[in-house]
Amino acid sequence: LSSVVIPKTVEGLDFGELIEGGKNPNDGAAIISCPAPFGQWARRWGGREFRGIRTVSHTYVEDLRGPWLMFDNEQDPYQLNNLLNVPGNEKLAGDLKQILKRKLKATNDEFLPGQVYVKKWAYPLDKTGTVPYSN
């Protein structure tokens, strides 16, 4: 739109064509993630690394051990009922897993343990394993 060249390091979708009346680049699935659990969701409170996708109809999440959560966002908007291990949902879980795999590959996300990212990005941690914050 502004004729500025987008650097190769910029991640995400370019909606410029859509704004000009063209194709929508969105495939309907957004990545959700917790690269390293800390703060309000620290390990001591059950926090864990995860990657997932959210579509209009479903949310699917994996932790480092594998599939973890799957919700029907239309029937269960508060995500109270994990459908992952409910018989009959295997195909849906498999389809959502493939979308997640494709998204992670497209974003070069290796989905490694949180400590790898803490070291890579040189985050300082306090004694609780949380990035300190002061206002």
Write out the residue ranges for each language-model feature.
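Generic preference for hydrophobic
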Residues: 30-33, 60, 70
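Long, internal low-complexity/basic segments
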Residues: 83-135
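Intrinsically disordered, low-complexity polar regions and short flexible loop motifs
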Residues: 76
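Polar, surface-exposed loop/tail segments
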Residues: 1-49, 89-99, 112-118
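Conserved beta-strand positions that form and line the central face of beta-propeller blades
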Residues: 14-17, 79-83
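Short conserved micro-motifs at the rims of enzyme active sites and ligand-binding pockets
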Residues: 41-45, 64-65, 72-73, 83
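Low-complexity, glycine/alanine/valine/leucine- and proline-rich hydrophobic stretches
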Residues: 45-67
